[in-house]
């Protein structure tokens, strides 16, 4: 099968650039091309292709074709619309969409970890997006197989990663890390999603707890695994999304009118209403607030 290169996609990468391309049959793909002949970069690119080629999960990028030995080294992958960098602003305060996107990311991360793969460069730019239910973790160039005897290109003391998303232990030594380093990065990504890149406060204490636990500077105090992390995320978001029907909303507003809700419940209800409710329900909610409650919410 022949492939034809079209336009460059996004910003230049570290060792490779990504372009739109199409096959001789007219199908659209993306192609990542190595742009240097540096020996270490070539070895890392070849390792990325070998590792990615053996993975098979809808939330991890797949390789369709490749050439890592010729003069022009490349691999072909599915074409995605964008990374989640462009989508995150649209997710703010929309808990349904947040949960869908977060679930996709975590499913991919769980798969990588259970295959014994550390990503080590997880960030929004490396998470590709077609829809809220079609998301893939990409760019496994810095990934490593846990407990593998294969060639290791990271030497003791080497450091790589992106400043905001790199764990403290990886900032010291990128070789001596485990799956907790990816959990740290996910915590920062979750914070990006719920705050629109830190423009707004974290919406509630439960999400704040998850972020804090993911990003604890001590790796052994983070979630024990990405699967344990997902279980906590599921519990928190499913609880946040319970109030969706008009009957539930009416019941909650009635409790508020009777003074039977504490402020944390009021705050959570407000967030749920902003994501799910019709304008008349939101109006009833604000009319039911006392002056003090309104001022507290306004301050928040």
Residue positions per predicted region:
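AlphaC helix of the eukaryotic protein kinase fold
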Residues: 35, 39-54
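Short beta-strand micro-motifs within the conserved protein kinase catalytic domain, predominantly
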Residues: 62-73
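AlphaC helix of the protein kinase catalytic domain
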Residues: 84-94
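Activation segment signature within eukaryotic-like protein kinase domains
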Residues: 101-102
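Catalytic-loop of the protein kinase fold
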Residues: 113-130
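Conserved activation segment of eukaryotic-like protein kinases, specifically the C-terminal portion
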Residues: 153-170
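Regulatory extensions appended to serine/threonine kinase catalytic cores
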Residues: 241-300
């Amino acid at each position: 099968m022949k492939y034809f290169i079209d336009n460059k996609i996004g910003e230049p990468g570290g060792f490779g650039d990504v372009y739109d391309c199409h096959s001789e049959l007219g199908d659209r793909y993306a192609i990542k091309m190595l742009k240097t002949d540096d020996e270490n970069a070539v070895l890392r690119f070849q390792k990325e292709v070998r590792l990615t080629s053996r993975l098979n999960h809808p939330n991890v990028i797949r390789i369709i074709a490749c050439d890592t030995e010729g003069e022009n080294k490349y691999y072909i992958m599915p074409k995605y619309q964008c990374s989640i960098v462009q989508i995150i602003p649209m997710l703010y305060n929309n808990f349904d969409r947040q949960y869908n996107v977060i679930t996709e990311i975590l499913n991919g991360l769980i798969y990588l970890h259970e295959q014994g793969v550390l990503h080590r460069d997880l960030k929004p730019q490396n998470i590709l997006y077609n829809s809220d239910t079609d998301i893939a973790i990409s760019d496994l160039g810095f990934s490593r197989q846990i407990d593998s005897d294969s060639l290791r290109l990271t030497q003791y003391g080497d450091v790589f990663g992106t400043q905001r998303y790199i764990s403290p232990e990886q900032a010291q030594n990128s070789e001596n890390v485990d799956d907790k380093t990816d959990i740290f990065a996910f915590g920062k990504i979750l914070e990006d999603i719920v705050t629109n890149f830190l423009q707004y406060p974290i919406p509630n204490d439960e999400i704040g707890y998850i972020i804090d636990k993911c990003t604890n500077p001590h790796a052994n105090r983070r979630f024990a695994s990405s699967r344990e992390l997902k279980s906590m995320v599921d519990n928190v978001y499913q609880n946040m999304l319970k109030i969706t029907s008009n009957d539930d909303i009416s019941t909650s507003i009635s409790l508020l009118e009777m003074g039977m809700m504490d402020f944390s419940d009021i705050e959570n209800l407000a967030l749920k209403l902003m994501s799910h409710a019709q304008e008349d329900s939101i109006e009833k909610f604000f009319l039911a607030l006392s002056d003090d409650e309104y001022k507290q919410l306004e301050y928040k």
